[in-house]
């Protein structure tokens, strides 16, 4: 199925086939949508991005399907979850992890440094599955909170059910003087 990006803001970025109707139209899905393709909808009516995959029916109505978005919590809440039995998955690079990491964290890199850039770890899901079961309670952290959010989204999409992203990552963890190992 071909997918179209459907954005409620005027700034589309590099999305091909993107359309940007006024926000009031998007809330009710009254705008004209392509009838034979999927549509990604960004709902910006509140402060959190809520992405949905929507498809049009034979009558042109839109049926929306929610895409799983990870829950993000502050580091102090993440620490409480770890104390309550959640396991910590650190998705930073091995070099970042070796400098220091939260106590009892397991490192499975989401990305690897290659030259001056980064590439996604092609074995990420398989490696995570070797340490965790799909229903394990897992908190996921990275350096600043961005990579862990992407990793959390991938894990939810892969069927993991108890995923919690750590907002602010290891930087916030150390700023709050939470326990680390070196």
Swiss-Prot record:
GO terms for biological process: response to jasmonic acid; response to oxidative stress; response to wounding. Its main location: plastid. It comes from the Eukaryota. SUPFAM superfamilies: Rhodanese/Cell cycle control phosphatase. The active site is at 142 (cysteine persulfide intermediate). Keywords: Chloroplast, Plastid, Thylakoid, Transit peptide. InterPro entries: Rhodanese-like_dom, Rhodanese-like_dom_sf, Thiosulfate_ST/Rhodanese-like. SMART domains: RHOD. One of its GO terms (cellular component) is thylakoid. Residues 1-65 form a transit peptide. Coiled coil: none annotated. The keyword Thylakoid applies. Induction: By senescence, dark, sucrose starvation, 3-O-methylglucose, salicylic acid, methyl jasmonate, methyl viologen and infection by the pathogens A.brassicicola and P.syringae pv. tomato. Residues 82-182 form the Rhodanese domain. It is found in: Plastid, Chloroplast; Thylakoid. PANTHER family: RHODANESE-LIKE DOMAIN-CONTAINING PROTEIN 15, CHLOROPLASTIC. This is Rhodanese-like domain-containing protein 15, chloroplastic.
């Amino acid at each position: 199925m071909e997918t179209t990006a459907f954005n409620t803001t005027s700034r589309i970025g590099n999305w091909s086939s993107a359309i940007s109707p006024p926000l009031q139209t998007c809330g009710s899905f009254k705008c004209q949508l392509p009838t034979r393709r999927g549509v990604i909808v960004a709902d910006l009516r509140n402060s959190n991005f809520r992405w949905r995959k929507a498809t049009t029916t034979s009558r042109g109505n839109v049926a929306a399907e929610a895409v799983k978005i990870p829950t993000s919590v502050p580091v102090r809440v993440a620490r409480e979850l770890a104390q309550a039995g959640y396991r910590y998955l650190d998705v930073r690079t091995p070099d970042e992890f070796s400098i220091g990491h939260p106590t009892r964290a397991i490192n499975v890199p989401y990305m690897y440094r290659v030259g001056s850039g980064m590439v996604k770890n092609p074995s990420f899901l398989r490696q995570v599955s070797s340490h965790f079961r799909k229903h394990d309670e897992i908190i996921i952290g990275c350096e600043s909170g961005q990579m862990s959010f992407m990793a959390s989204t991938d894990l939810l999409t892969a069927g993991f059910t108890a995923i919690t992203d750590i907002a602010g990552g290891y930087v916030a963890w150390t700023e709050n003087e939470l326990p680390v190992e070196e």
